[in-house]
Amino acid sequence: MEEEFPTISLLGIDFNLSNILMITVTCVIVLLIAIICTRNLQRRPTGKQNFIEWVMDFVRGIINSNMDWKTGGRFHVLGITLLMFIFVANMLGLPFQIAINDEVWWRSPTADPIVTLTLAIMVLGLTHYYGIKMRGFKHYFVGTYFSPMKFLFPLKLVEEFANTLTLGLRLYGNIFAGEVLLTIIATQLAHMNIFVGVLAIIPALLWQGFSIFIGAIQAYIFTMLTMVYMSHKVSDEH
């Protein structure tokens, strides 16, 4: 199923306007959630404050399961941002898809491998940055690529490449597959008679609910693996 997207060319580089739009929408939604949930903070949290504190505690648990809080506390905001951004991005394309003149404008940005691989490269880049910053270049390089044995260096390089690919493509594959199946179901419903169409709505809603679950799980997995990779780079025992 070939899809077309609106693009704009700058300096010979094509930019996907759909991705730009959806990433912007995702950022705005996450920002609004953060602002709304942190307004008028109370000592005894209720409602929306409970939600944001639950997210913070959830990410804290992810970090504590991979490294001590003294080391990992600085990545708390990163984890919260990744979890919320990816979850919201995964949800945007589930209710509907908008296409104008056969060009798709509205869908989940994480259904594009360029977006997910960019996220993965950013995350792996941060792990290297903090590894060097916290351990020093020599200690980091030797400990990461030549430990426990020097002949493992080529395999360590392959591992870095594989981690980037799997982190990005896992997220893309799950979200893209979910949206493709929802599109197929919606197309089939449009060609059914009213009675059969009403009955077919039930499995469509069930699949949409399952897709929400998958989107949440993928946001968790991406955040968890980010902290796993980070702990490998910044902790001496790894």
From Swiss-Prot:
Signal sequence interval, chain numbering: none
Record keywords: ATP synthesis, Cell membrane, CF(0), Hydrogen ion transport, Ion transport, Membrane, Transmembrane, Transmembrane helix, Transport
Subcellular location: Cell membrane
Any one annotated GO CC term: proton-transporting ATP synthase complex
Chief location: membrane
Membrane-spanning residues: 17-37, 80-100, 112-132, 194-214
SUPFAM superfamilies: F1F0 ATP synthase subunit A
Topology with respect to the bilayer: Multi-pass membrane protein
InterPro entries for the chain: ATP_syn_F0_a_bact/chloroplast (IPR045082), ATP_synth_F0_asu (IPR000568), ATP_synth_F0_asu_AS (IPR023011), F0_ATP_A_sf (IPR035908)
Disulfide bonds: none
An example Gene Ontology biological process: proton motive force-driven plasma membrane ATP synthesis
GO molecular function terms attached to this record: proton-transporting ATP synthase activity, rotational mechanism
Family, per entry: Belongs to the ATPase A chain family.
Function: Key component of the proton channel; it plays a direct role in the translocation of protons across the membrane.
Subunit and interaction comment: F-type ATPases have 2 components, CF(1) - the catalytic core - and CF(0) - the membrane proton channel. CF(1) has five subunits: alpha(3), beta(3), gamma(1), delta(1), epsilon(1). CF(0) has three main subunits: a(1), b(2) and c(9-12). The alpha and beta chains form an alternating ring which encloses part of the gamma chain. CF(1) is attached to CF(0) by a central stalk formed by the gamma and epsilon chains, while a peripheral stalk is formed by the delta and b chains.
Protein name: ATP synthase subunit a
Organism, as annotated: Listeria monocytogenes serotype 4b (strain CLIP80459)
Gene of this entry: atpB
